[in-house]
Regions:
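Residues forming the flavin
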Residues: 1-149
């Protein structure tokens, strides 16, 4: 069975003003396969990344879910963080609860429920992920251009 850690980011008040991050963290902590769940003001900060690394080592996590801002913003940061802790960087899923919840909802209960749903989806996905490794393919350095006008 997978050992998944869930990390819910406040993004300062960007997320925490609209989403009850503590309720999200608590709800996702009860999902099957989740052995650790917490929340922190800025998961992308050095302190936040250290929380992730320490939890991976202490709880022997096999997968990580981060509920935060857009993956475009910090997915590379979080992949490096989990890799630095010894976990395959592809055993990470990011649930975008900033742009998809807090920035579009005014009702805190609705935004919180949607954040929990997005977190559950990310947990389900990381349970299906498999560790990947980067590979190389031979390339023949030739090209044929047809047309050109």
């Amino acid at each position: 069975m997978q050992r998944i850690g869930v990390f819910v980011c406040w993004c300062g008040s960007n997320i925490a003003a609209t989403v009850d991050v503590k309720a999200v963290s608590e709800a996702l902590g009860h999902e099957p396969g989740v052995v650790f769940s917490t929340n922190y003001q800025y998961m992308c900060s050095e302190a936040g990344q250290n929380i992730i690394k320490d939890a991976i080592k202490e709880h022997h996590l096999t997968g990580v879910v981060i509920c935060s801002c857009s993956p475009r913003m910090h997915e590379a940061t979080f992949r490096k963080t989990v890799a630095a802790a010894g976990l395959n960087s592809y055993m990470l899923e990011v649930a975008n609860i900033r742009e998809q919840c807090s920035w579009i909802h005014k009702d805190k209960a609705e935004a919180t429920e949607k954040a929990i749903i997005l977190g559950r989806a990310a947990i389900a996905k990381v349970q299906l992920n498999a560790p990947l490794t980067a590979g190389e393919s031979p390339v023949t350095k030739r090209a044929l251009v047809i047309g050109g006008g």
